[in-house]
Amino acid sequence: GDVYKRQVQLIVGKKGKGKTKQLLDKVNSEVKDIAGSIVYLDKSTKHMYELNNKVRLIDVSRYMIENESEFLGFVCGIISQDHDLEQMYFDSFLKIAALEDKDISAVVEKLERMSDFFQVDFILSVSRDESELPESVKDKIIVSL
């Protein structure tokens, strides 16, 4: 089977630094080479027209998510319904996962286990400076703005 190691990747930087553009550029270039499906989670539908039409946008704000457990359950629900899923993008990760003033390490660690188990990549934009992030997630940073 597919021996490619799935992973969790972070695009980090303070608000307004251009993380969403990096995320959109990444998803739109990856979609050309990926056979399976891609889902993009965001806090609104604002970026709908900037996404390739093969990417499914889900506006998480519509689903009454109140904490990180509900968010992870929501993500598992999406995975359970799509056996071709290869990548999930989480824009405004802190907001959509209800982690705005919280430590993200436990959630990132669980996403890592899910990534391995379900063979899905997770690419997250995180509105924090690299210096504000726990050591345990620093090796997952692919872009620091």
PLM region descriptions:
Residues 1-4:
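Short, small-residue-biased leader/transition segments that mark boundaries at the very start
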Residues 81-82:
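N-terminal targeting/trafficking signals and adjacent low-complexity tails
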Residues 8-78, 133-136:
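Conserved P-loop
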Residues 19, 67, 71-74, 85, ...:
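Amphipathic alpha-helical interface surfaces
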Residues 9-11, 38, 85-90, 122:
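Generic beta-sheet signal
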